[in-house]
């Protein structure tokens, strides 16, 4: 199934696109968010966003301590399903035990 045909997934502290835009302090009008997870726990925050724009797939990763938030960290990097799959299966993507931002299993299911 094409990712664009799936219902967007918002996990943990995010429930919609507006929450993502507010936390990053950025305009997301031309962004099609596909999958987003953010957790703020023990004075630290960790975020991951997968989105489509102009037919290309991008991801944004952000993190912060208690002093700041995600503002100024909206720095999209182009990605592929293959790259995400590799990082999910061979690395530790989506398995953050410090901030509790656990989204690896959900992202694996979403992109397959």
Spans of model-derived segments:
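Low-complexity intrinsically disordered segments
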Residues: 1-12, 22, 75-112
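Compositionally biased, low-complexity repeat tracts
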Residues: 15, 40-43, 58-59, 65-68, ...
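Amphipathic, interaction-prone secondary-structure segments
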Residues: 22-64
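Intrinsically disordered, low-complexity regulatory segments enriched in Ser/Thr/Pro
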Residues: 54-83
């Amino acid at each position: 199934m094409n990712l664009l045909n799936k219902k967007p997934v918002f996990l943990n502290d995010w429930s919609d696109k507006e929450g993502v835009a507010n936390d990053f302090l950025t305009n997301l009008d031309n962004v099609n968010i596909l999958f987003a997870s953010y957790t703020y726990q023990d004075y630290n925050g960790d975020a991951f966003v997968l989105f489509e724009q102009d037919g290309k797939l991008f991801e944004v990763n952000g993190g912060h301590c208690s002093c700041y938030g995600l503002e100024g960290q909206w720095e999209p990097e182009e990605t592929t399903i293959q790259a995400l799959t590799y990082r999910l299966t061979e690395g530790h993507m989506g398995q953050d035990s410090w901030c509790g931002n656990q989204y690896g299993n959900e992202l694996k299911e979403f992109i397959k």
